[in-house]
Curated annotation (Swiss-Prot):
Name the UniProt record assigns to this protein: Leucine--tRNA ligase
Species for this entry: Lactobacillus acidophilus (strain ATCC 700396 / NCK56 / N2 / NCFM)
NCBIfam families named among the record's database cross-references: leuS_bact
GO MF term (any one): ATP binding
Reactions it catalyzes: tRNA(Leu) + L-leucine + ATP = L-leucyl-tRNA(Leu) + AMP + diphosphate
Motif 'KMSKS' region: where in chain: 573-577
Length: 804
């Protein structure tokens, strides 16, 4: 009887001892790079949702090795970050020790699942030998003017003691811990991602990525063509610019809105309005950008008491502030045309502001008219459509020096500072004379110093500020300086890790260019869709910078991306707080890793979110036990192949075997694992009914199932008499001629009524088919005492006998 505990440990030990999955370097073979999004090693370990994507890449990796490719299939750890630091603060443990322990647990779990990783290429983002190169990339960006310091509005969480990203805020509180967040201006390191906006947008077209992910990135970059218009402030020499995609509606502008953080606000607010304006600014400081720009939220705002002059008609328009305008987007100011914009209409209606139509159509007493129509109330634009009116208005603005054609982006520069301990130190020194310099490259890595007190400082400095021996430096001329105390965000190390896997032990450069040329771009990258606009955009940005530096040979990092769905429990995402986590260790102990791998691939399409069924692994174990019994006789002390496995081929399984090899190969390539497994079940049913199973087909089937259930298939392969691992046994092939039926079913009619049917060789001779039809006992019964007048034979289909 098959014992999964014994067999799985045996083969995991064998693979480790023999370096079975060491990346091939045969220059005569093609290369294939299959990559998983590496995990953050949390204290909770893996749950059964994690192995879904990992199993998918593992199946493809195992197939590609068998197809004769050199395969790079690595794994590593995204080890810096806030959760480890929070845990360390709570328990008093060292974050480095916490990380090491968590990695050991994750690695144990991954190895129990039988994944074919090349562990010689393992990387950890918190390892100084790794983050030396993260710091090196930062330094190259600084030299190119892509890393800079700026005072920017940020989401500040005093409780976490750091800035948090917009995406990490829910209902004005931090996603992690539910702490309040406040808007404040802080000195931050920024990366100039906006310099790459056009390339990030255009190069999406060439990628084999899910369309929804590409669309999310397009929207995040948010390129829009329009005009920048300058408004003068009444009774003042001050001006402000607005960006609009609809310069043709400028005649309809009836008010303007500034972001509450806009520096102009305090300068132009009248004494009568100052208290109200300041109260409003205080009220909205805990809202994230995402909340503020939510289209469905109630519109709020306050009049500043000041007026601007509409440049096209000289009319005075009131200047308001509202939280839906962000200082960090565009110019931090907008013009409002309520007659033709839904948000402006709702705002104007609520606060009783004028609504001036400039397009013909609709009923603006009921709603904004947002479609096209001839321009009205617009002097030199009257009668024109939108396209022509836009062009003419931009020409007018440029001619009168109060505006110009402009491209705008939603994309912002990347806020690259965190006020925490557990992250990569930023390799910068601030000197007392105001100069800022980089740590010399030959002194990298700038190591994160060991610290016993990593509590947030509560100031814009990280806990590193407390380590005065590390912070304070003196150069050879006696000039004093301080090290940068902010650290990098946890997205830094994950922006380039796939490059380091190619050459993980290189201490002279990030990775050898010729090796990168052999392996890039990544052929298959599988991970969660939640990374669409953060990690995937950051990695593309870093890659393009490195391409411009001549460090990498390709414009894009990941050629093919696939997002696995979620595995839910009781229709909810698994989480410790909900108590609905299924631990893979328990499933493996009871049913085996092969059963778990197979169940996760058979649950449904890889990209679907599906509910976990506790009985699922039991059903795939039953199937695998059937496979074992079909091929292996283990009744005696030594397991041997079943007697039904023979060297001869009677042809009975030809067609189903050819269909199975074809479908499984195509489905594995297309990541349709559930339908591939269904086809293997079809073959199993046919093989169980067959009198004998040709050895060629038995071995071929085992090779097809090996990527899904590698431990059992290694064992069966050994029972079949092979000394080598199945991992490099040549992938199964089929004869296309055998996909076609060798026999056909012929219907026999007597005087138009069906009286019998029989099997005949395909394309058999007409006379032979007619003879077989006439000899059928049931047909002869209906021909007794009659003369056969005519016999019509339709090849491969029907014999029609006319008798009287």
């Amino acid at each position: 009887m098959y014992n999964h505990k014994v067999v799985e440990k045996k083969w995991q030990d064998y693979w480790a001892k023999h370096d079975t999955f060491k990346t091939g370097t045969d220059s005569n073979k093609k290369n294939y790079y299959a990559l998983d999004m590496f995990p953050f090693p949390s204290g909770k370990g893996l749950h059964v949702g994690h192995p879904e994507g990992y199993t998918a890449t593992d199946i493809v990796s195992r197939m590609k090795r068998a197809q004769g490719y050199n395969v790079l299939h690595p794994m590593g750890w995204d080890a810096f970050g806030l959760p480890t630091e929070q845990y360390a603060l709570k328990t008093g443990e060292d974050p480095e020790v916490v990380t090491k322990n968590n990695i050991a647990n994750f690695k144990r779990q991954l190895n129990k699942l039988g994944f074919s990783y090349d562990w010689d290429r393992e990387v950890t983002t918190s390892d100084p030998n790794y983050y030396k190169w993260t710091q090196w990339v930062f330094e190259q960006m600084y030299k190119k003017g892509l890393a800079y310091e700026a005072e920017v509005p940020v989401n500040w969480s005093p409780d976490l003691g750091t800035v948090v990203a917009n995406e990490e805020i829910v209902d004005g509180k931090t996603e992690r811990g539910g702490y309040p967040v406040y808007r404040r201006n802080m000195r931050q390191w920024m990366l100039k991602m906006t310099a790459y906006a056009d390339r990030l947008l255009e190069d999406l077209d060439d990628l084999d990525w899910p369309e929804p992910v590409k669309e999310m990135q397009r929207n995040w970059i948010g390129r829009s063509l329009g005009a920048q218009v300058t408004f003068k402030i009444k009774d003042s020499d001050k001006t402000f610019d607005i960006f609009t995609t609809r310069p043709d509606t400028l005649f309809g502008c009836s008010y303007t809105v500034l972001a509450p953080e806009n520096k102009l606000v305090q300068e132009i607010t009248t004494d009568a309005q100052r208290d109200e304006v300041n109260a409003y600014i205080k009220k909205i400081e805990s809202k994230s950008d995402l909340e503020r720009t939510d289209l469905n939220k109630d519109k709020t705002g306050v009049f500043t008491g000041a007026y601007a002059i509409n440049p096209v008609n000289g009319k005075e328009v009131p200047i308001w502030i509202s939280d839906y305008v962000l200082a960090s987007y565009g110019t931090g100011a907008v013009m409002a045309v309520p007659a033709h914009d839904e948000r402006d209409y709702a705002f104007a209606t609520k606060f009783g502001l004028p609504i001036n139509p400039v397009l013909e159509g609709g009923d603006i007493t009921k709603e904004a008219f947002t479609e096209d129509g001839p321009h009205i109330n617009s002097e030199f634009l009257n009668g024109l459509n939108i396209k022509d009116a836009k062009k003419k208005m931009v020409e007018w603005l440029e001619e009168h020096n109060c505006g110009e054609k402009k491209v705008n982006y939603k994309l912002r520069d990347w806020d690259f500072s965190r006020q925490r301990y557990w992250g990569e130190p930023i390799p910068v020194i601030h000197w007392e004379d105001g100069e800022t310099t980089l740590v010399p490259e030959d002194q990298l890595p700038l190591r994160l110093p060991h610290a016993t007190d990593i509590k947030p400082s509560g100031t814009p400095e990280s806990p590193l500020a407390n380590l005065t021996d590390w912070v304070n430096v003196v150069d050879e001329n006696g000039r004093k300086g301080k090290r940068e105390t902010n650290t990098m965000p946890n997205w830094a190390g994950s922006s380039w890790y796939y490059l380091r896997y190619v050459d993980p032990h290189n201490d002279k450069e990030l990775a050898d260019y010729d090796l990168l040329k052999k392996w890039l771009p990544v052929d298959l990258y599988i991970g969660g869709a939640e990374h669409a606009v953060r990690h995937l955009l950051y990695a593309r940005f870093w890659h393009k910078v490195l391409y411009d530096l001549g460090v990498v040979p390709t414009k894009e990092p990941f050629q093919r991306l696939y997002n696995q769905g979620l595995i839910l429990k009781n229709h909810e995402k698994m989480s410790k707080s909900k108590g609905n986590v299924v631990n893979p260790d328990d499933v493996i102990d009871e049913y085996g890793a092969d059963s778990l791998r197979m169940y996760e691939m058979f649950m449904g399409p890889l990209d679907a979110s599906i509910d976990w069924d506790d009985n699922g692994p039991a059903s795939t174990k039953k199937f695998l036990d059937r496979v074992w019994r079909l091929f292996v006789n283990d009744l005696d002390l030594k397991a041997i192949p079943q007697e039904r496995i023979v060297d001869e081929n009677d042809g009975e399984l030809d067609k189903v075997y050819a269909e199975t090899v074809k479908k499984v190969t195509e489905d594995f390539d297309a990541l349709h694992f559930n339908t591939a497994i269904s086809q293997m079940m079809v073959f199993m049913n046919a093989a169980q009914k067959a009198k004998t199973i040709p050895r060629e087909y038995a071995e071929g089937f085992v090779k097809l199932l090996a990527p899904v259930a590698p431990h059992m298939m290694e064992e069966i392969w050994q029972v079949f008499g092979h000394d080598e691992s199945i991992s490099y046994a040549e992938w199964s092939t089929y004869d296309p001629a055998k996909l076609v039926e060798s026999t056909v079913e012929i219907m026999v009619q007597v005087n138009g009524k069906l009286r019998g049917k029989f099997q005949a060789a395909k394309d058999a001779d007409r006379d032979e088919v007619q003879k077989q039809a006439m000899e059928l006992p049931h047909v002869q019964k209906f021909l007794e005492g009659k003369d056969v007048k005519k016999v019509i034979v339709v090849p491969n289909k029907i014999v029609n006998i006319v008798a009287k």
